[in-house]
From Swiss-Prot:
<feature type="glycosylation site" description="N-linked (GlcNAc...) asparagine">
    <location>
        <position position="90"/>
    </location>
</feature>
<feature type="glycosylation site" description="N-linked (GlcNAc...) asparagine">
    <location>
        <position position="121"/>
    </location>
</feature>
<dbReference type="GO" id="GO:0005576">
    <property type="term" value="C:extracellular region"/>
</dbReference>
<dbReference type="GO" id="GO:0004622">
    <property type="term" value="F:lysophospholipase activity"/>
</dbReference>
<feature type="glycosylation site" description="N-linked (GlcNAc...) asparagine">
    <location>
        <position position="168"/>
    </location>
</feature>
<feature type="glycosylation site" description="N-linked (GlcNAc...) asparagine">
    <location>
        <position position="487"/>
    </location>
</feature>
<dbReference type="GO" id="GO:0005783">
    <property type="term" value="C:endoplasmic reticulum"/>
</dbReference>
<feature type="signal peptide">
    <location>
        <begin position="1"/>
        <end position="21"/>
    </location>
</feature>
<keyword id="KW-0442">Lipid degradation</keyword>
<feature type="glycosylation site" description="N-linked (GlcNAc...) asparagine">
    <location>
        <position position="343"/>
    </location>
</feature>
<dbReference type="GO" id="GO:0046475">
    <property type="term" value="P:glycerophospholipid catabolic process"/>
</dbReference>
<feature type="glycosylation site" description="N-linked (GlcNAc...) asparagine">
    <location>
        <position position="386"/>
    </location>
</feature>
<dbReference type="InterPro" id="IPR002642">
    <property type="entry name" value="LysoPLipase_cat_dom"/>
</dbReference>
<feature type="glycosylation site" description="N-linked (GlcNAc...) asparagine">
    <location>
        <position position="51"/>
    </location>
</feature>
<feature type="glycosylation site" description="N-linked (GlcNAc...) asparagine">
    <location>
        <position position="457"/>
    </location>
</feature>
<feature type="glycosylation site" description="N-linked (GlcNAc...) asparagine">
    <location>
        <position position="563"/>
    </location>
</feature>
<dbReference type="GO" id="GO:0004623">
    <property type="term" value="F:phospholipase A2 activity"/>
</dbReference>
Length: 649
């Protein structure tokens, strides 16, 4: 069944049955459902869930075959490829792969799409000129903010391919049709825009009328969904995150395990720092490995009022709260950054006053971010000793964009020792520099986190400072970190090897603004094409041995644990691609401009609203994902604000 047939079938099932794993209300509004009277929805984060563990057994069947094929092809010119056979002689010695897709708005979604396409054997030319089959060999696929839009789009559209999306780009209701701004989706067709926002308003107001707290992220997530699920009724208004459990391609383990990342915001605060609790959403659960929570809950029953995991009303749960768009919006919600900086922007005064007024009202109720209420972790007993209990004591759970702690690549869920990942491909489409290219800042932040209180139970390989990243060219092309496990023994455990793939110019200036909210068909294709080239060293033209080097990185952890002989070609690869510990901290101008720097956000917002960006633009603003003006708490007045803002976009 192809993508279009599946989408039509899914919509038909939705209207015919209504329930299944979709929202039981057939709408955006959560609803009460029956559940076991003795059910407990929370567990300690002592390892993967039973559901994930059982799923991994199915996935391993597919990755084993795909990885063997990839490694055989990649090492076909090696003088000695016996290591591949040695690894596959025992199931426990087969490497486990993860891919992490960074944030960065549509830039990250499109460039990241090209990078994933380079790893996907369903992409035209990926086997001949790329890393085709690597994605089929991958167990975990994590996304954050714009990277989560990419992961969520592929996973929740029946594991479609980037190639299929590209092939259908000119069709009606095509995925990622962002020719018009998300704020003005109808373009010159004003009626279309008004109708869209009327539907969004109705959906969110329905949730509010049912007694659930709503926030700007509800609106943002609903608006985004029309771009990701255009063939589903009203952008999948009743499509839930847990629906994926019942989709055959996931049930059978034919696709990677998708993970979305968001940050927790402590009650009564606005600033997000490196000690923020990192949350993950997967098809079975949401929660955190961090000691400040150390727990997971069943994502299907979010919205249920609980005490330490037990429903307050025995035998009664809530379902439909885990709307797919809401969770994808949560990972890209940046409204609190504007709350900090809106007054310093150069917006026209009447719009600034309008926006600031709404933001002030929202701030008082802390509705400027994603709010999960009732708190699914209320009274949880799994928080580790000597850590704040503020999350469990609050009636609400507050979540924000997963990169606001400066970890713009979702690495934390993938480096957990219990998941046994051997290598992580870190796709970095951040806008860290003045010219909106990455500079390794995300890797630096995750490395530093392991030495903070939140990093009590994690490890990450050594990486250099940002200046060294730039001075040594580590942010211009793929680089490997943690190549020698013998140098990592002083960490909590041996972490995965990290293959860092940064956004870089090959055939197109892909350093576009995160606030660029519309792309023409041509721009989309060029962004995707450039991403493919960034992941493949220019279609393997810059280095014809790169695929073999990727194979070496994949095998490295298991090769060292077995004390097996390293092919001489791998030694050459590691000399060329592994960071060898050299530091060059010569001052570099234009760094420290993170996607999530609130000061940069204000100037970025101003620039976006006063400049016109063309397809050849090599500049842009530096703020991630959900950089939209605040929306009024009175949903009936939403169009007033949107119409005013649309005139400046």
């Amino acid at each position: 069944m192809n993508l279009k047939e599946w989408l039509l079938f899914s919509d038909a099932v939705f209207f015919a049955q209504g329930t299944l794993a979709w929202s039981p209300s057939n709408s955006y509004t959560p609803a009460n459902v029956s559940c076991d009277e003795d059910i407990n929805l929370i567990r300690q984060a002592s390892g993967p869930s039973d559901n994930e563990t059982e799923w991994l057994k199915k996935r391993d069947v597919y990755t084993r075959e795909a990885l063997r094929s990839f490694l055989d092809r990649a090492t076909s010119n090696f003088s000695d490829s016996s290591l591949v056979s040695q690894l596959f002689s025992n199931a426990s010695d087969i490497p486990r792969i993860a891919v992490a897709c960074s944030g960065g708005g549509y830039r990250a979604m499109l460039s990241g799409a090209g990078m994933l396409a380079a790893m996907d054997n369903r992409t035209d030319g990926a086997n001949e000129h790329g890393l085709g089959g690597l994605l089929q060999s991958t167990t975990y696929l994590a996304g954050l903010s714009g990277g989560n839009w990419l992961v969520g789009t592929l996973a929740w559209n029946n594991w479609t391919s980037v190639q299929d999306i590209v092939n259908n780009m000119t069709e009606d209701d095509s995925i990622w049709d962002i020719s018009n701004s998300i704020i003005n989706p109808g373009g010159f067709m004003i009626v279309t825009t008004i109708k869209r926002w009327d539907h969004i308003s109705d959906a969110v107001e329905g949730k509010q009328d049912a007694g659930f707290n709503v926030s700007l992220t509800d609106i943002w997530g609903r608006a985004l969904s029309y771009n990701f699920f255009p063939s589903l009724y009203r952008g999948g208004v009743a499509y839930t995150w847990s629906t994926l459990r019942d989709v055959e391609v996931f049930q059978n383990g034919e696709m990677p395990f998708p993970i979305s990342v968001a940050d927790g915001r402590y009650p009564g605060t606005q600033i997000i720092d490196l000690n923020a609790t990192v949350f993950e959403f997967n098809p079975f659960e949401m929660g955190s490995w961090d000691p400040t929570l150390n727990a997971f809950t069943d994502v299907k029953y979010l919205g249920t009022k609980v005490s330490n995991g037990e429903p307050v009303n025995k035998g009664q749960c809530v379902a439909g709260y885990d709307n797919t768009g809401f969770i994808m919006g949560t990972s890209s919600s940046l409204f609190n950054q504007f709350l900090l900086q809106i007054n310093s922007t150069s917006l026209p005064s009447f719009i600034k006053n309008l926006v600031t007024g709404f933001l002030d009202d929202l701030s008082e109720d802390e509705d400027d971010i994603a709010i999960y209420a009732p708190n699914p972790f209320k009274d949880t007993s799994y928080i580790q000793d000597n850590f704040s209990k503020s999350i469990s004591e609050s009636d609400y759970l507050y979540l924000v964009d997963g990169g606001e702690d400066n970890q713009n690549i979702p690495l934390v869920p993938l480096v957990q020792d219990e998941r046994n990942v051997d290598v992580i491909f870190a796709l970095d489409n951040s806008a860290d520099t003045d010219y909106y290219w990455p500079d390794g800042a995300s890797l630096v932040s995750t490395y530093e986190r392991q030495f903070s209180s939140q990093g009590l139970n994690m490890s990450f390989p050594y990486v250099p400072d940002k200046r060294t990243f730039v001075n040594l060219g580590l942010a211009d092309k793929p680089s490997f970190f943690g190549c020698d496990a013998q140098n990592l023994t002083d960490l909590n455990y041996i972490p995965p090897l990290v293959v860092y793939i940064p956004n870089a110019r090959h055939s197109y200036n892909s350093n576009t603004s995160t606030f660029k909210l519309s792309y023409t068909d041509d721009e989309r294709l060029k962004m995707i094409k450039n991403g493919f080239e960034a992941a493949t060293r220019g279609n393997l033209t810059d280095d014809s041995s790169f695929m073999g080097c990727v194979a070496c990185a994949v095998m490295r952890r298991k090769q060292q644990s077995l004390n097996a002989t390293l092919p001489e070609e791998c030694s050459t690869c590691f000399t060329n691609y592994c960071w060898n510990g050299t530091i060059d901290d010569t001052p570099v101008s234009g760094l420290d401009n993170s996607d999530f720097d609130p000061t940069a956000a204000s100037s970025a917002y101003s620039a976006y609203n006063t400049e016109s960006y063309s397809s050849s633009s090599a500049t842009g603003s530096k703020k991630n994902g959900a950089g939209l003006p605040a929306t009024p708490t009175s949903f009936t007045s939403i169009l007033t604000l949107l119409t005013a803002i649309a005139g400046f976009l």
